[in-house]
Amino acid sequence: MANKIFLDTNIVVDFIIKREFELAATEQIFDSIHNNKLEAYISESVISTSIYLLRQYKIDTLAIFRDLCKFIHVAAFNRNVLFMPIEKFSDTEDGLLYFLANHNKMNYFITRNKKDFVYTVPSLSVLTPDEFIKTIFSPR
């Protein structure tokens, strides 16, 4: 069974605009998703926030997300997520996304800003793209 990963907004934006931060690892993650080696999820808010952040680049973000959603699942929020300890996060959106991923039994939460994730649960690791690639694809 493939590892289930949740992609934070910054990872999706980095991939779309080819931002240099850990770009090789980010591209390897998306290649693995496309080749069905990883089962990836985002949320509706990741899509809407990314579209908002990418408006300055004058690219067809709707077409990009239509394509991405052919191989990336969209996890829906439900009220159970709202009752999780989101207030432990300094960034409410990060808390919502993290607990959405946890509620949907993800194995890994991939983000560029690990510092915002001071409260985590043992069943859901928070990793940068490089850390994830080293953890999953490095020989043991």
For every predicted segment, state its role.
Residues A2, H103-R140:
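Acidic, PIN/NYN-like endoribonuclease modules and their adjacent C-terminal/linker elements
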Residues D14-I16, T49, Y119:
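A short acidic, helix-capping loop that chelates divalent metal ions and anchors anionic groups
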Residues F89-D91, R140:
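Short, surface-exposed amphipathic charged segments that create phosphate/polyanion-binding patches used
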Residues E27-K88, G95, F99, P122:
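PIN-domain endoribonuclease scaffold, especially VapC-family toxins
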Residues D8, D94, N113:
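Acidic active-site catalytic centers that drive phospho-/nucleotidyl reactions
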Residues I11, V46, V81, L97, ...:
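Alpha-helix capping/helix-boundary segments
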Residues I11, S50, L100, N107-T111:
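Short, hydrophobic/aromatic-rich beta-strand segments within well-structured domains
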Residues M1-A40, Q56-D60, L127, K134-R140:
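Short, well-structured N-terminal submotif of metal-dependent ribonuclease cores
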